[in-house]
Amino acid sequence: MELWAPQRLPQTRGKATAPSKDPDRGFRRDGHHRPVPHSWHNGERFHQWQDNRGSPQPQQEPRADHQQQPHYASRPGDWHQPVSGVDYYEGGYRNQLYSRPGYENSYQSYQSPTMREEYAYGSYYYHGHPQWLQEERVPRQRSPYIWHEDYREQKYLDEHHYENQHSPFGTNSETHFQSNSRNPCKDSPASNSGQEWPGELFPGSLLAEAQKNKPSLASESNLLQQRESGLSSSSYELSQYIRDAPERDDPPASAAWSPVQADVSSAGPKAPMKFYIPHVPVSFGPGGQLVHVGPSSPTDGQAALVELHSMEVILNDSEEQEEMRSFSGPLIREDVHKVDIMTFCQQKAAQSCKSETLGSRDSALLWQLLVLLCRQNGSMVGSDIAELLMQDCKKLEKYKRQPPVANLINLTDEDWPVLSSGTPNLLTGEIPPSVETPAQIVEKFTRLLYYGRKKEALEWAMKNHLWGHALFLSSKMDPQTYSWVMSGFTSTLALNDPLQTLFQLMSGRIPQAATCCGEKQWGDWRPHLAVILSNQAGDPELYQRAIVAIGDTLAGKGLVEAAHFCYLMAHVPFGHYTVKTDHLVLLGSSHSQEFLKFATTEAIQRTEIFEYCQMLGRPKSFIPSFQVYKLLYASRLADYGLVSQALHYCEAIGAAVLSQGESSHPVLLVELIKLAEKLKLSDPLVLERRSGDRDLEPDWLAQLRRQLEQKVAGDIGDPHPTRSDISGAGGTTTENTFYQDFSGCQGYSEAPGYRSALWLTPEQTCLLQPSPQQPFPLQPGSYPAGGGAGQTGTPRPFYSVPETHLPGTGSSVAVTEATGGTVWEEMLQTHLGPGENTVSQETSQPPDGQEVISKPQTPLAARPRSISESSASSAKEDEKESSDEADKNSPRNTAQRGKLGDGKEHTKSSGFGWFSWFRSKPTKNASPAGDEDSSDSPDSEETPRASSPHQAGLGLSLTPSPESPPLPDVSAFSRGRGGGEGRGSASSGGAAAGAGVGGLSGPESVSFELCSNPGVLLPPPALKGAVPLYNPSQVPQLPTATSLNRPNRLAQRRYPTQPC
């Protein structure tokens, strides 16, 4: 058997085989060629024959840089094995999802990019020739699920086929191997190294030697084989495990291959097809048309046949279309008559009566009510409804009367005394007759009244059922007695008696039947409703509540039609499907079920008839929430091919929407215009116009477009609806009461990123705290119309963000406050009580004036309390200091002091005063000074705000300004800062922020001078006759450096620290 070397496949582009620099690799010492094992990725190994005599260049190391080599033409006279069509067909497609030893696709020359990048040794990444039998070398059908991954590989296949088909020299010529497309034989490492097929160039001795040396491969070192194959240890073990007959000879390829096979195997589009067989595309048109394209193959020259079918004709026999055709809607046309509507309702009622379902009788009653309303032009009278209710109740039920069970006079459980026959009277000794006549009963009642025994007379009358005498006599007595007689009378009636329901309702109570009707032991619910509707007197609200209670009870029992009948009698308005608490949405359909079962065609038609009956008495009395269901009904008409009727519905809905004016919903308006735009060509008036006027729309559609444009323009011009939409997008609802209440005084201007979240000013953030002691309530109209810098500057989040204190940036005001929050923080620092500073007390003041935080600051947590936990004596000293200091100020400061007094009154009234700690519960465990100040800082009363890098320059500047005039009542601001933070001067951003809050009242107006003069120096407090406003807990932390604006600390050391 002749030995065949395995056929080589083209290597990956850009990774050509380089000559080897190792003289011992692939050769024997005697100069003869020895096979070098190569590894296939499924474990099959093959031998590459190399000849150092015929190789133009030595083979390069695998790790050397790969360079593109020029292709060498085959020598004249060399015979090359023809490439079958299977090579071209399956070379670019993965035809197996999972590996199978011996059946792997061995012709796969170009791997995916990921596979090419996995192996760095391109010269060793080749597959061996497949060991397939002759009957297996048949082109398989292409799998539609396995497509090529790289476009270049697909392009390579196409170019290769083109060369095979159009080569004038056949398949074995030299020109075929010198073409632009890569040849599997030429691009293989064997051809690049000058190696040819055995039997052509190698003598028989070499072939025999090679065959003799084959068993020696098994004795080769595993490490050498791994290094030569480029596989890792685990990959090599796997390849050895799944190796399938590496020494088996390859049978010769089929010589009967022809280019025709290549045409058959390669026929197919370059891109994946959506369908693999001819199919039928179908589309629905807006005019009730069905567009049908017959199956055809355009590649075979077959023309596609397009057919147009009418949906009205196709669905002519369907029940849904028949139900829609039988209804003469919309009911606002001039050609609609009441007789047609009444006939339609009577037919529906008759159909309901024939059915034996649970609610068939109630459904027929609802249709009969619509007939009555249509006959009476929408007006309802209680007696007419009662007559309708009692039509099916011809045989009145015999309600069993209850015997009296208790003596109502002494309220005991004794039965009524019954005189037996033949028993002598103990007083007179006479034997009374067995049955007393009515005359005798009345005579005895009169005799008791002769002697003034009223209660005995009432008892006798009630015992003998003289309820008229008893009720009249009790009505002339006290109210308790009358109520007692009434209760005795009603107790003799059956609980399910309609008289019981009427008497309970007349007594001012909701009857018991309202909560118990619908049950089997209570009987029919109709007589109870009839007696209520026919005898409406007194409080109409009580009667309405009783009827609604009956409807709710029936709805709870599943009697939807009966419940809706009661709701119509109580004049309950129609609601919405999404609001489950609404009683009524569509007549005869419960909105607690899914929408497809809820919005039935019959329910929509029934509700439209009720709307029509209302418009008979009151024109244009549309049901606003029902218009969307009419639009749904119009869409169903268009789907079933009834396009003209659907367009009439669009016109009717448009008339209802135009009558509502601005209250119409914009979404309904947009969807109505869309549907009308599709159906407008079915209007005969549009079709009858001239060809140049075909684009003109109906007048009602043009009016709808104008109304939509006005609504959109109004929404853009009005900022309040825009804010409501933004707040809804930011996670809140448009019914946000807080946002609506303060929308008039916010004065926002939308920034580019404004729609991402809802931002509020610091003043509004204070209002969001859950504490009952709300500090500084916002007064409506206190802001200018355009808003200040606090409103137009950096936005503040609606949610809470932990504060971050950056070291080396000054006080925490500069770190945490934005443009508009600087002045607000200064006012809080000026008017807060002891211990309410924003930074830790353990701070030092360097000589350069910059405050350095000595230890890391913990984020300030938001607290509902609005006061600090300082001592009572410290608070009193603060107030005394403020009063003494204010008396020694100049007249210019007198007005400022008046503002401060107003602010204090406002502060006390708002729960943020000096003694507000008195109304709160102090903490049991005293915390350190740093923790106390961190938890009681003014920022903790507000929602914490995140700091930004540019906010540090907008706060208080600690550099004093010598030319600034002093201001009074600012010692409270400098007291809690260790003496160093009391020099308040605002930067350029602070001046703008001060202008933004110029209209504030109360404590906000106190710092107006401070806000308007950003370079002001806070003066030291007056030391004569006044107590320094310092917290004694700060004495150990006071720095040694002195300053002109710092007060004398000697007086502060005189007072020991007060417990909290």
Curated annotation (Swiss-Prot):
GO cellular component: cytosol; endoplasmic reticulum exit site; endoplasmic reticulum membrane; ER to Golgi transport vesicle membrane; Golgi membrane; intracellular membrane-bounded organelle
Keywords assigned: Endoplasmic reticulum, ER-Golgi transport, Golgi apparatus, Membrane, Peroxisome biogenesis, Phosphoprotein, Protein transport, Transport
Biased composition (Polar residues): 51-60, 165-195, 213-222, 837-847, 1031-1046
Topology of the protein relative to the lipid bilayer: Peripheral membrane protein
Region ranges (Central conserved domain (CCD)): 271-713
InterPro entries reported for this sequence: Sec16_CCD, Sec16_Sec23-bd
Gene Ontology terms: biological process: endoplasmic reticulum organization; endoplasmic reticulum to Golgi vesicle-mediated transport; Golgi organization; peroxisome fission; peroxisome organization; positive regulation of gene expression; positive regulation of protein exit from endoplasmic reticulum; protein localization to endoplasmic reticulum exit site
Alphabetical list of Pfam families matching this protein: Sec16, TPR_Sec16
Segments for region (Disordered): 1-86, 163-236, 245-264, 711-733, 770-796, 834-1060
PANTHER family, per database record: PROTEIN TRANSPORT PROTEIN SEC16B, RGPR-RELATED
Protein known as: Protein transport protein Sec16B
Species name: Homo sapiens
Taxonomic lineage: Eukaryota, Metazoa, Chordata, Craniata, Vertebrata
